[in-house]
Amino acid sequence: MRKQTRFKFNAFMSRLAELNGVDTGDLDKKFSVEPSVTQTIMTRVQDSSSFLTRINIVPVPEMKAEKIGLDVSGTIASNTDTAGGDERETADFATLDAEGYFCQQVNYDFHIRYNTLDLWARYQDFQTRLRDAIVKRQALDRIMIGFNGTHRAKTSNRVKFPLLQDIAPGWLQKYRENAPSRVMNKVVAEDGSVVSEKLRVGAGGDYANLDALVMDATNNLIAPWYQEDPELVVICGRQLLADKYFPLVNQEQPNTEAMAADLIISQKRIGNLPAVRVPYFPADALLITRMDNLSIYWQEDTHRRHMVENSKRDRIENYESINEDYVVEDYACGALVENIELLPAKPTDPQTKAALTSSGEDIKTLAGAIVEAVKAAAAPAEPVADVEVKGPEEAPVDDKVKGGK
């Protein structure tokens, strides 16, 4: 470590000790992070990701208890015939299911090599860069666990489970375990027999396109009082969005059609719902829900940390842990669709291709007519010359009518 790096790193360590109320020499021993510091760190973790800013990251006092829940679950309006002796009954404003939450320890341990610190020491914001690097990685790991976690291993294996599947059950796994009736992963007939082990999307498949699949899942798997919720979104990965919009851009287009394609792609909608692309989401799945239906609970006073300078390996080691859990607030406000198979597009036969070409020409003609109409409507009106308006010419009066003989 260079002299300048040592000076800036020591300043970072001094600041860390000051914030947590410990001596600088005790940072290599495990200490409890001050609650205010933990809150600040968790806020920075949330703010570092556009996705995390839209979900809940909530401190809870207990390791295990009931969930906080959404603002309102279900309906509360009712009628009661009190004159007939019936009593009015209140509805639970925020129904809590029996699952609850269970915060368990998750480690966020890492090391930074001396040569990396030497590079960062060239900048005036050395401490900010070091802090932000830690915060960003923790944020990405939490997203990865939330969408890929399936179980909790006593000792995790990053080589065997590169997507952190063995750290903790994530949101998708919670749906599989606690609300299987709201998970669609195969096609089942009315008699219960399995028609297809996959959800085939495309020509000749179970659904013509992703829009139909999302609409079907919304109508059949989500509770009726949530189906019309304007905050519902479709959470998915990059690949599904690419497969949906690729045909729009994989062709030569006139400027007008290219602009229309850009507009459609920029809106990013699936099944008439906004599509939200998040990192590390499974490529063959999508989750329909409100963003605030997903939460990360972290237990207060469980944030532990210590930093060690391991000169034998030319690096600084940071050991950090906190108790946390991934929570779905209300399973009725969501549906998980997975095991999606996108079928390859079938080649267009000559007759259909000719019809499509003809249809395309009609559309271009219509588009041109609309453009001309808009131009005409936008153009200033030309002044109209004054014209004497004459009434209908009077018929000649017969002399006899005048009284002539």
Q: Where do the protein language model's features map onto the residues?
A:
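Beta-rich carbohydrate-recognition and catalytic domains
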Residues: 224, 235
